[in-house]
């Protein structure tokens, strides 16, 4: 984030994407772009990307009354790229995919999951592009069931499984994860490793209590489909919920 809350820059091979959603950041970028020597100039000199793509959009900007902007900020070419992280390959679309195209912030945690996955049956909940599940398979997981409410996300994850040659050990379902976990529990399907990487559960302060209930519910349901001695890997990206409150919800 370069020390600026609300500003995210992601470099993937020779393509750079950025998005911002907080008040003041848009003006900061306008000032940067208008200066003779800008931060974008410095990024070009340092990384020489073929394309810098802006995605400043979403509910946060609308709440603040900020205009949305989406498109090339510098350079030209296709906003689609194939990347490799830790030997795992992903097709990335910074134009149509989530935020900046791929969530690189969970790379370290994916590596931890990879080290725990050998021989395990895995549930990749809120799978997005399939990152956690594919790292698990790279670490020797027996099989992965990936679930996301977004059908395009599941299809992207399916394509990424094919890209890595692991389609035979990967299956995906486009379904609300809360309901999917109930169904799995009721039919007795269990997993050695359950991964829960949910989207933000609160967009405003008024939504914090509902978000905490959501974390309690989803993690209880995740535990309900674990084998005895199984592992639950869970996370939060809800900015309005601090770590102490989140851990308290998990203990509940």
What label would you give each PLM region?
Residues 5-8, 12-13, 19-37:
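N-terminal targeting segments
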Residues 120-126:
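Conserved class I S-adenosyl-L-methionine
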Residues 191-221:
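Mobile active-site "lid"/loop adjacent to the S-adenosyl-L-methionine
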């Amino acid at each position: 984030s370069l020390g600026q809350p609300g500003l995210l820059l992601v470099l993937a091979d020779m393509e750079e994407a950025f998005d911002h959603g907080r008040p003041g950041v848009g003006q900061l970028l306008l000032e940067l772009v208008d200066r003779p020597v800008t931060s974008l100039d410095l990024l070009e000199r340092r990384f020489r990307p073929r394309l810098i793509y802006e995605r400043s959009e979403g509910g946060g900007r609308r709440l603040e009354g900020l205009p949305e902007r989406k498109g090339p900020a510098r350079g030209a070419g296709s906003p689609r790229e194939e990347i490799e992280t830790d030997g795992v390959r992903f097709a990335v679309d910074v134009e149509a995919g989530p935020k900046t195209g791929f969530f690189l912030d969970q790379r370290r945690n994916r590596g931890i999951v990879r080290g725990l996955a050998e021989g395990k049956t895995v549930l990749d909940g809120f799978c997005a592009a399939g990152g956690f599940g594919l790292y698990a398979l790279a670490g020797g997981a027996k099989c992965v069931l990936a679930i996301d409410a977004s059908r395009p996300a599941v299809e992207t994850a399916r394509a990424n499984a094919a890209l890595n040659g692991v389609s035979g050990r990967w299956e995906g379902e486009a379904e609300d994860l809360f309901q999917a976990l109930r169904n799995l529990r009721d039919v007795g399907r269990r997993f050695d490793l359950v991964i829960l990487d949910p989207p933000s559960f609160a967009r405003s302060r008024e939504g914090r209590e509902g978000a905490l209930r959501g974390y309690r519910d989803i993690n209880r349901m995740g535990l309900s489909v674990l084998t005895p001695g199984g592992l639950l890997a869970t996370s939060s990206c809800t900015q309005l919920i601090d770590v102490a409150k989140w851990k308290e919800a998990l203990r509940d």
